[in-house]
Protein backbone atom coordinates (compact mmCIF):
# COMPACT_ATOMS: atom_id res chain seq x y z
CA UNK A 1 0.00 0.00 0.00
CA UNK A 2 1.34 3.43 -0.97
CA UNK A 3 1.05 5.90 1.89
CA UNK A 4 -0.96 9.15 1.75
CA UNK A 5 -3.57 10.41 -0.71
CA UNK A 6 -3.10 12.34 -3.94
CA UNK A 7 -5.49 13.11 -6.77
CA UNK A 8 -6.08 15.08 -9.92
CA UNK A 9 -9.07 16.07 -12.03
CA UNK A 10 -9.84 17.97 -15.21
CA UNK A 11 -12.18 20.90 -15.53
CA UNK A 12 -13.18 23.19 -18.38
CA UNK A 13 -9.90 24.98 -19.06
CA UNK A 14 -7.54 23.36 -16.59
CA UNK A 15 -6.66 20.79 -13.95
CA UNK A 16 -6.53 20.55 -10.16
CA UNK A 17 -3.91 18.42 -8.41
CA UNK A 18 -4.06 17.75 -4.67
CA UNK A 19 -2.28 15.82 -1.93
CA UNK A 20 -2.22 15.68 1.85
CA UNK A 21 0.85 16.65 3.93
CA UNK A 22 1.26 13.69 6.29
CA UNK A 23 4.23 11.34 6.13
CA UNK A 24 3.83 8.18 8.19
CA UNK A 25 5.83 5.01 8.42
CA UNK A 26 5.39 1.86 10.48
CA UNK A 27 2.55 3.37 12.51
CA UNK A 28 4.28 6.67 13.30
CA UNK A 29 3.68 10.14 11.90
CA UNK A 30 7.09 11.36 10.72
CA UNK A 31 6.01 14.73 9.32
CA UNK A 32 2.92 16.89 9.15
CA UNK A 33 4.27 19.33 6.56
CA UNK A 34 5.58 17.35 3.57
CA UNK A 35 4.89 18.82 0.14
CA UNK A 36 3.66 16.23 -2.35
CA UNK A 37 2.44 18.50 -5.15
CA UNK A 38 5.01 19.89 -7.58
CA UNK A 39 4.95 22.26 -10.54
CA UNK A 40 7.13 20.79 -13.31
CA UNK A 41 6.80 23.66 -15.79
CA UNK A 42 4.28 26.46 -16.31
CA UNK A 43 1.62 24.08 -17.62
CA UNK A 44 2.31 20.71 -15.98
CA UNK A 45 2.29 19.49 -12.38
CA UNK A 46 2.50 16.25 -10.40
CA UNK A 47 0.81 15.07 -7.20
CA UNK A 48 2.35 12.12 -5.38
CA UNK A 49 1.74 9.47 -2.75
CA UNK A 50 4.38 7.15 -1.33
CA UNK A 51 7.73 7.41 0.40
CA UNK A 52 9.12 10.97 0.30
CA UNK A 53 12.66 9.92 -0.59
CA UNK A 54 11.32 8.05 -3.61
CA UNK A 55 8.94 10.66 -4.98
CA UNK A 56 11.37 13.52 -4.29
CA UNK A 57 14.08 11.69 -6.24
CA UNK A 58 11.63 11.00 -9.08
CA UNK A 59 10.57 14.64 -9.24
CA UNK A 60 14.19 15.87 -9.19
CA UNK A 61 15.19 13.50 -12.02
CA UNK A 62 12.01 14.41 -13.90
CA UNK A 63 12.61 18.17 -13.60
CA UNK A 64 16.20 17.79 -14.79
CA UNK A 65 15.17 15.74 -17.83
CA UNK A 66 12.26 18.03 -18.69
CA UNK A 67 14.54 21.09 -18.49
CA UNK A 68 17.01 19.39 -20.84
CA UNK A 69 14.18 18.42 -23.23
CA UNK A 70 12.87 22.00 -23.29
CA UNK A 71 16.34 23.48 -23.90
CA UNK A 72 17.15 21.03 -26.69
CA UNK A 73 13.76 21.28 -28.41
CA UNK A 74 13.08 24.96 -27.68
CA UNK A 75 9.51 24.21 -26.63
CA UNK A 76 7.69 23.42 -23.41
CA UNK A 77 7.08 19.80 -22.44
CA UNK A 78 3.44 18.75 -22.56
CA UNK A 79 1.59 16.72 -19.91
CA UNK A 80 1.95 13.70 -22.22
CA UNK A 81 5.75 14.20 -22.44
CA UNK A 82 6.00 14.40 -18.64
CA UNK A 83 3.78 11.36 -18.05
CA UNK A 84 5.67 9.21 -20.57
CA UNK A 85 9.05 10.14 -19.08
CA UNK A 86 7.78 9.30 -15.59
CA UNK A 87 6.49 5.98 -16.90
CA UNK A 88 9.94 5.15 -18.28
CA UNK A 89 11.67 6.13 -15.01
CA UNK A 90 9.29 3.97 -12.96
CA UNK A 91 9.49 1.04 -15.38
CA UNK A 92 13.30 1.06 -15.26
CA UNK A 93 13.20 0.65 -11.49
CA UNK A 94 10.48 -2.00 -11.31
CA UNK A 95 12.72 -4.96 -10.45
CA UNK A 96 14.84 -3.20 -7.84
CA UNK A 97 11.82 -1.57 -6.21
CA UNK A 98 13.56 1.79 -6.27
CA UNK A 99 10.49 4.01 -6.44
CA UNK A 100 7.71 3.36 -3.92
CA UNK A 101 5.41 6.01 -5.35
CA UNK A 102 2.19 6.53 -7.26
CA UNK A 103 1.72 9.75 -9.20
CA UNK A 104 -0.91 11.84 -10.94
CA UNK A 105 0.31 14.11 -13.75
CA UNK A 106 -1.90 16.98 -14.80
CA UNK A 107 -1.62 19.91 -17.14
CA UNK A 108 -2.72 21.64 -20.30
CA UNK A 109 -1.61 21.33 -23.89
CA UNK A 110 -3.05 22.61 -27.18
CA UNK A 111 -5.82 19.99 -27.09
CA UNK A 112 -6.95 20.90 -23.56
CA UNK A 113 -6.53 19.65 -19.99
CA UNK A 114 -4.99 16.22 -19.35
CA UNK A 115 -4.79 13.89 -16.33
CA UNK A 116 -2.55 10.81 -16.26
CA UNK A 117 -2.14 8.28 -13.45
CA UNK A 118 1.00 6.17 -12.94
CA UNK A 119 1.50 3.10 -10.78
CA UNK A 120 4.84 2.13 -9.17
CA UNK A 121 5.74 -0.14 -12.13
CA UNK A 122 5.25 2.61 -14.71
CA UNK A 123 1.73 1.73 -15.86
CA UNK A 124 0.24 4.84 -17.48
CA UNK A 125 -3.42 5.70 -18.11
CA UNK A 126 -5.16 8.89 -19.16
CA UNK A 127 -8.30 9.67 -17.14
CA UNK A 128 -10.74 12.48 -16.40
CA UNK A 129 -9.83 12.14 -12.72
CA UNK A 130 -7.78 9.81 -10.57
CA UNK A 131 -6.74 9.24 -6.97
CA UNK A 132 -3.74 7.28 -5.68
CA UNK A 133 -2.38 6.17 -2.32
CA UNK A 134 -3.85 4.68 0.82
CA UNK A 135 -6.92 6.95 0.73
CA UNK A 136 -7.57 6.46 -2.99
CA UNK A 137 -10.66 4.26 -2.62
CA UNK A 138 -12.40 6.86 -0.49
CA UNK A 139 -11.37 9.80 -2.69
CA UNK A 140 -12.30 7.91 -5.87
CA UNK A 141 -15.79 7.26 -4.53
CA UNK A 142 -16.36 11.00 -4.13
CA UNK A 143 -14.82 11.81 -7.51
CA UNK A 144 -16.91 9.17 -9.31
CA UNK A 145 -20.10 10.41 -7.69
CA UNK A 146 -19.66 14.14 -8.30
CA UNK A 147 -17.31 14.61 -11.29
CA UNK A 148 -18.97 15.91 -14.44
CA UNK A 149 -17.63 17.00 -17.82
CA UNK A 150 -17.29 20.75 -18.27
CA UNK A 151 -16.95 21.58 -14.57
CA UNK A 152 -15.90 25.12 -13.71
CA UNK A 153 -12.63 25.81 -11.91
CA UNK A 154 -14.53 26.61 -8.71
CA UNK A 155 -16.49 23.35 -8.89
CA UNK A 156 -13.32 21.34 -9.53
CA UNK A 157 -11.44 22.92 -6.62
CA UNK A 158 -14.39 22.28 -4.31
CA UNK A 159 -14.62 18.65 -5.48
CA UNK A 160 -10.88 18.08 -5.01
CA UNK A 161 -11.10 19.52 -1.50
CA UNK A 162 -14.15 17.40 -0.66
CA UNK A 163 -12.54 14.18 -1.91
CA UNK A 164 -9.33 14.93 0.02
CA UNK A 165 -11.23 15.80 3.22
CA UNK A 166 -13.17 12.53 3.04
CA UNK A 167 -9.98 10.52 2.48
CA UNK A 168 -8.22 12.29 5.35
CA UNK A 169 -11.15 11.72 7.70
CA UNK A 170 -11.12 7.94 7.11
CA UNK A 171 -7.48 7.08 6.28
CA UNK A 172 -5.02 7.21 9.19
CA UNK A 173 -2.07 7.45 6.78
CA UNK A 174 -3.36 10.72 5.28
CA UNK A 175 -3.82 14.07 6.96
CA UNK A 176 -2.47 17.41 8.17
CA UNK A 177 -3.76 19.63 5.40
CA UNK A 178 -4.27 19.72 1.65
CA UNK A 179 -2.02 21.26 -0.97
CA UNK A 180 -3.78 22.20 -4.20
CA UNK A 181 -2.18 23.11 -7.52
CA UNK A 182 -4.51 24.71 -10.05
CA UNK A 183 -3.22 24.98 -13.63
CA UNK A 184 -5.04 26.92 -16.37
CA UNK A 185 -3.98 28.57 -19.62
CA UNK A 186 -3.57 31.80 -17.62
CA UNK A 187 -1.02 30.27 -15.25
CA UNK A 188 -0.82 28.23 -12.07
CA UNK A 189 -1.28 28.78 -8.36
CA UNK A 190 -0.77 26.79 -5.17
CA UNK A 191 -3.20 26.84 -2.26
CA UNK A 192 -3.01 25.26 1.18
CA UNK A 193 -6.12 24.20 3.09
CA UNK A 194 -5.60 23.38 6.77
CA UNK A 195 -7.44 20.25 7.89
CA UNK A 196 -7.77 19.36 11.52
CA UNK A 197 -7.23 15.66 12.13
CA UNK A 198 -7.40 13.66 15.32
From Swiss-Prot:
Catalytic activity: Cleavage of peptide bonds with very broad specificity
Activity regulation note: The formation of the proteasomal ATPase PAN-20S proteasome complex, via the docking of the C-termini of PAN into the intersubunit pockets in the alpha-rings, triggers opening of the gate for substrate entry. Interconversion between the open-gate and close-gate conformations leads to a dynamic regulation of the 20S proteasome proteolysis activity.
Propeptide residue range(s): 1-4
One Pfam family from the record: Proteasome
Domain of life: Archaea
Keywords noted in UniProt: Autocatalytic cleavage, Cytoplasm, Hydrolase, Protease, Proteasome, Threonine protease, Zymogen
PROSITE patterns: PROTEASOME_BETA_1 (PS00854), PROTEASOME_BETA_2 (PS51476)
Subcellular location: Cytoplasm
GO MF term list: endopeptidase activity; threonine-type endopeptidase activity
Location of the active site: 5 (nucleophile)
One annotated Gene Ontology cellular component of this protein: cytosol
Main subcellular location: cytoplasm
EC number: 3.4.25.1
Gene Ontology terms: biological process: proteasome-mediated ubiquitin-dependent protein catabolic process
Database matches in SUPFAM superfamilies: N-terminal nucleophile aminohydrolases (Ntn hydrolases)
Enzyme class at the top of the EC tree: hydrolase
Chain's role: Component of the proteasome core, a large protease complex with broad specificity involved in protein degradation.
Family: Belongs to the peptidase T1B family.
Record note on quaternary structure: The 20S proteasome core is composed of 14 alpha and 14 beta subunits that assemble into four stacked heptameric rings, resulting in a barrel-shaped structure. The two inner rings, each composed of seven catalytic beta subunits, are sandwiched by two outer rings, each composed of seven alpha subunits. The catalytic chamber with the active sites is on the inside of the barrel. Has a gated structure, the ends of the cylinder being occluded by the N-termini of the alpha-subunits. Is capped at one or both ends by the proteasome regulatory ATPase, PAN.
Name recorded for this polypeptide: Proteasome subunit beta 2
Organism: Korarchaeum cryptofilum (strain OPF8)
Gene that encodes the chain: psmB2
Amino acid sequence: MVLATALGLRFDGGVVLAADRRVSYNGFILSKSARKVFLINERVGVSTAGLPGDFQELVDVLKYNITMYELENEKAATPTNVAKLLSILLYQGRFSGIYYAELVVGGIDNSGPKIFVLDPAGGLMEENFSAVGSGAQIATGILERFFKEGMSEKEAVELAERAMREAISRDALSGDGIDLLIITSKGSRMEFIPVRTA
